[in-house]
Curated annotation (Swiss-Prot):
Zn(2+) is required for amidase activity. InterPro entries: Amidase/PGRP_sf (IPR036505), Amidase_domain (IPR002502), NAMLAA_amidase_2 (IPR051206). One of its GO terms (molecular function) is N-acetylmuramoyl-L-alanine amidase activity. The keyword Protease does not apply. The lineage of its organism: Bacteria, Pseudomonadati, Pseudomonadota, Gammaproteobacteria, Pasteurellales. It comes from Haemophilus influenzae (strain ATCC 51907 / DSM 11121 / KW20 / Rd). GO terms for biological process: cell wall organization; peptidoglycan catabolic process; peptidoglycan turnover. One of its GO terms (cellular component) is cytoplasm. This is 1,6-anhydro-N-acetylmuramyl-L-alanine amidase AmpD.
């Protein structure tokens, strides 16, 4: 695994970049103060194939899989995806608002997309995440916290924490203790 070096003007300096059209400007970019951990797999329970890239770019082909026909018109994105092998792709500049949290609330404040960074792990609620993913997530988190100091350990949450009636990610197999033990 290679170490993540830095963030410059909201972009990781040394990772794969694919621009998603599914974002807009934050109301206040200086207010970035929450990190939200998600999981995604397309099709469900399947990994690889590049379908998350297609989905976040609005290019998912509904004919490829029955599930895609249900979701291909959704306009969603995350700031980054960490694949099973640990590779990180950034889709949205951290200073912009990705559309990952939906209806959400953190400590009484709604619209978490306004002040949150969203990280997707390629995974599901049916199996553990990989060592490579934990390594990359820990490295990425430390670089994000250095660049956005309002994000502290107590402001790192799962999607399930900000949308508890709608979402379960990052799920039962996400090892919060392992992850947070290496976050500085």
């Amino acid at each position: 695994m290679r170490k993540i070096k830095d963030i410059e003007k909201g972009l990781l300096t040394d990772c794969r970049q694919i621009q998603s059209p599914h974002f807009d400007k934050r109301p206040n970019p200086q207010d970035i103060s929450l990190l939200v951990i998600h999981y995604i797999s397309l099709p469900p329970e399947q990994f690889g194939g590049g379908y998350v890239d297609d989905f976040f770019q609005g290019k998912l082909d509904p004919k490829i899989h029955p599930y895609f026909a249900e979701i291909y018109q959704m306009r969603v994105s995350a700031h980054c995806l960490i694949e099973r092998n640990g590779r990180i792709t950034q889709y949205v500049n951290f200073n912009d608002r990705a559309w990952h949290a939906g209806v959400s609330n953190f400590q009484g404040r709604e619209k978490c997309n306004d002040f949150a960074i969203g990280i997707e792990l390629e995974g599901s609620n049916e199996q553990p995440f990989t060592d490579a993913q934990y390594f990359s997530l820990q490295e990425l988190t430390n670089v994000i916290m250095k660049s956005y100091p309002k994000i502290t350990k107590d402001r790192i949450v799962g999607h399930c924490d900000i949308s508890p009636k709608r979402k379960i990610d990052p799920g039962q197999y996400f090892d919060w203790e392992r992850y947070l033990s290496s976050v500085k």
